[in-house]
């Protein structure tokens, strides 16, 4: 049996073992996010997929309407004039083979890596260090592109890349405790719609298994997925 702190025990006592409507769940998570910093709000969604099969893998991006409230560091591997273009567009790091060499040595002071197509043969060799961290650029995720300015601005504004892990669970941050309930709800609705639109072709049986949201230091609250889907139909 887990030993919880007095604070967590108090917070857990406020959460019933049932699913809540989306807005109820958001209100409860915000109420429980009472740490001395602006806690991140996250979604943890179990899907009815087995990612060991290629037709049951999920990897995509979502542009959250209210952003994430989190600053991310972006690195760009490119060459020539595009290095300056990336820097001017807001990249925190930009370089050619020198940046590839730094990454290969384990120097990864960034949250997202973007590459132009011509540099992917070199970046692909970094699979050993990038793969386990989920940082390998991918065309489907918009991180392999010639439009560096557009990609950098989108990701800085709150566009997120996410994937289902080996257990078929998606982990996505979708805001901060300081966000309004309405902003968090819009982000959550957008996330659910994005996953639905990118449902793997090989998914069988019940697709939505469980849907929980939580704050950095708070307990998880289950969201009623049927009610969340109904909100989309009301649009």
UniProtKB/Swiss-Prot annotation:
**PROSITE patterns per the record?**
RIBOSOMAL_L1
User: Which InterPro entries does UniProt cross-reference here?
Assistant: Ribosom_uL1_bac-type (IPR005878), Ribosomal_uL1 (IPR002143), Ribosomal_uL1-like (IPR023674), Ribosomal_uL1/biogenesis (IPR028364), Ribosomal_uL1_3-a/b-sand (IPR016095), Ribosomal_uL1_CS (IPR023673)
Recall the GO molecular function terms of this protein's record. Answer: rRNA binding; structural constituent of ribosome; tRNA binding
What are the record keywords, sorted? Repressor, Ribonucleoprotein, Ribosomal protein, RNA-binding, rRNA-binding, Translation regulation, tRNA-binding
Function per UniProt: Binds directly to 23S rRNA. The L1 stalk is quite mobile in the ribosome, and is involved in E site tRNA release.
Instruction: Family membership, please give it.
Output: Belongs to the universal ribosomal protein uL1 family.
Protein's name in the database: Large ribosomal subunit protein uL1
Gene name linked to the record: rplA
